[in-house]
Design a protein with these regions (language model features):
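N-terminal Rossmann NAD(P)H-binding glycine-rich loop of SDR-like oxidoreductase domains
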Residues: 9-18
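Conserved glycine-rich Rossmann-like NAD(P)H-binding loop of the short-chain dehydrogenase/reductase
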Residues: 23-38
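Rossmann-fold cofactor-recognition segment
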Residues: 44-59
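Conserved Rossmann-fold cofactor-binding substructure of NAD(P)-dependent oxidoreductases
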Residues: 56-71
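Hydrophobic positions on the long internal alpha-helix
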Residues: 79, 113-117, 121, 166-167
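Catalytic loop of short-chain dehydrogenase/reductase
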Residues: 83-84, 88, 92-103, 122, ...
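C-terminal helical subdomain
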Residues: 161, 176, 183-184, 195-234
Length: 234
């Protein structure tokens, strides 16, 4: 399998690169800096082809497309993992800059990555897109008051809820083209952007996602999944 993974140099993204690579797959981790490219090349001597682009910028679409063309004719799986966290948990302290920054990465960044990988993805026999979402983007959970006030940022919850809608939009558009699109909550991960109640390492989360990708025989397109747990409500 040929796998494109955004945010591939740290946290969950790096662990996804590792687990797919360790199991014999070819990985194309997207990173923002030359330093990260060098580090990945040193870490993985073969079957790893770092892609250099900044998903916060529109030009990343062409950069992704052009670099992928140098390495491969097709991609089987796109994992949109790149993300940043918010800070403010009260509306009076929430500012437009923070909201804009998170929307830019979690939503526009996904759109840029999908556009950049589309030509290669469409050539796969079994193309898939996984958007790494979060339980915090679930309107159902929010409406049921599962998230204590003051514990989670406005901007992250809003950005992930918007990303979930984007997942469904992509699924609807790509359904007749054979491209499956799924949102995945990786678990409560202990990462730089992890929640206060995090209880799982990035490596554990990556392994759960990998096992689900490999073992799942059910079409989960248009679904919100927590690997090892089941389907979540939007």
């Amino acid at each position: 399998m040929r796998v494109f993974i955004t945010g591939g140099n740290r946290g969950l993204g790096l662990q996804l690169v590792k687990v797919f690579h360790e199991n014999g797959h070819i990985v194309y981790p997207l990173v923002r800096t030359e330093v990260a490219v060098t580090q990945l090349k040193q870490m993985f001597s073969c079957r790893c082809f770092p892609i250099l682009a900044d998903l916060s910028l529109d030009e990343s679409t062409e950069q992704i497309k052009n670099q992928l063309e140098e390495y491969t004719e097709y991609i089987d799986l796109v994992i949109n993992n790149a993300g940043i966290t918010g800070k403010e948990t009260e509306v009076l302290h929430t500012n437009s800059e923070e909201l804009t920054d998170l929307f830019n990465i979690h939503c526009l960044g996904v759109i840029r990555a999908v556009k950049g990988t589309y030509v290669a993805l469409a050539k796969s026999d079994h193309p898939r897109i996984i958007n790494v979402s979060s339980r915090l983007g679930s309107l159902h959970k929010m409406a049921n008051k599962e998230f204590p006030q003051g514990q989670f940022s406005y901007s992250y919850r809003i950005a992930k809820a918007a990303q979930n809608m984007l997942t469904l939009c992509l699924q609807q558009e790509f359904e007749n083209k054979g491209i499956r699109v799924t949102a995945i909550h990786p678990g409560k991960l202990k990462t730089d952007i992890g929640a206060f109640d995090a209880n799982m390492t990035p490596a554990e989360g990556a392994k759960n996602i990998y096992d689900w990708v490999i073992d799942s025989n059910v079409d989960a397109s248009g679904k919100f999944i927590e690997p090892g747990v089941g389907e979540l409500k939007w």
